[in-house]
Each structure stands twice: as structure tokens, then as C-alpha cells.
UniProtKB/Swiss-Prot annotation:
Name of the protein described by the UniProt record: Peptide methionine sulfoxide reductase MsrB
GO molecular function: peptide-methionine (R)-S-oxide reductase activity; zinc ion binding
GO biological process, one term: protein repair
NCBIfam families documented for this protein: peptide-methionine (R)-S-oxide reductase MsrB
Length: 147
């Protein structure tokens, strides 16, 4: 659902555009903080309840830390109680890449930025009735741009 705060036209303007942003680790080490490199490039996870965007309630768009591609809208953010920012959907399906993740003895679906392959978090099928999905995203993998 798109409210008046973020118009459908505005979301259409930030639709995924193919970018050649698959850069070597050396590039990312120089341009990211140590924590952002660990999470975004090495598929790490920030500690639960530690992210600066967890309790953000401002209106705007959430962009990829690595390439600034728009990924999520505040309209789709909700408090899942899991300790990480949660969304019921991305701004559109093309901005997210889905990968099977069998690490840590679990079966999960990893989510990555489709433009630069940055690790964002995971998606689970225990979300709200709107979509049934919970996109559980590390705060450090996102930059928030207030409307």
C-alpha cells in the first residue's frame, strides 16, 4: 500500500536500474566501515537490537549502503520484534536477489541487493497478512533518506 507520503510516481522513479557495481573486496574495504564490510560483503549479521534504523519511524526510502539503490519504503516497514528492521515487501521485486542459504545448520532465503550483490539479510514466510513475508534486514546494510 502506498500512502500520500510516498507517491507511487516517486517509487517508480527509483526502480532498479542495472548497474555494474560488482567490485572487488579491496574496493569495498576502502569504502565501507569495518562492520558494513563484514555484513554487506561477508554475509555477516549485526547484533540484534543494535541497529540504528531498527526504531526509525520517519517517512522515506531505505537505500543500499554500498550502491545507494532504493530498496525499501517506510510504508512497508513494521515492528516484527525480531531485533532487525523488518519490511513486508521491497519497493519492487527487481531490486532484491534471492539465494538459498544453508549456513549455520538452517535453511533460509538470503536477500541481496540486485545491483551490487550486497548482503542485506533474510526473508521469512512469517510476515504480516499484507504479504506474509518478513524481510529481515541489517541496519548497517541500509541508508535511510527521509522524505
Amino acid at each position: 500500500m502506498v500512502s500520500e507520503a510516498i507517491s507511487k510516481k516517486e517509487i517508480e522513479r527509483v526502480k532498479f536500474e542495472s548497474k555494474d557495481l560488482h567490485k572487488p573486496d579491496e574496493y569495498w574495504r576502502e569504502h565501507l566501515t569495518e562492520e558494513a564490510f563484514y555484513v554487506c560483503r561477508q554475509q555477516g549479521t549485526e547484533a540484534p537490537y543494535s541497529g540504528k534504523l531498527l526504531h526509525n519511524k520517519d517517512t522515506g526510502l531505505y537505500h543500499c549502503t554500498c550502491c545507494q539503490s532504493a530498496l525499501f519504503s517506510s510504508e512497508n516497514k513494521y515492528d516484527s520484534g525480531c531485533g532487525w528492521p523488518s519490511f513486508d515487501a521491497p519497493i519492487n521485486e527487481q531490486v532484491i536477489r534471492f539465494l538459498d542459504d544453508f549456513s549455520h545448520g538452517m535453511v533460509r532465503t538470503e536477500i541481496r541487493c540486485a545491483a551490487c550483490d550486497s548482503h542485506l539479510g533474510h526473508v521469512f514466510e512469517d510476515g504480516p497478512k499484507t504479504t506474509g513475508l518478513r524481510f529481515c534486514v541489517n541496519s548497517v546494510s541500509l541508508i535511510f533518506n527521509k522524505k
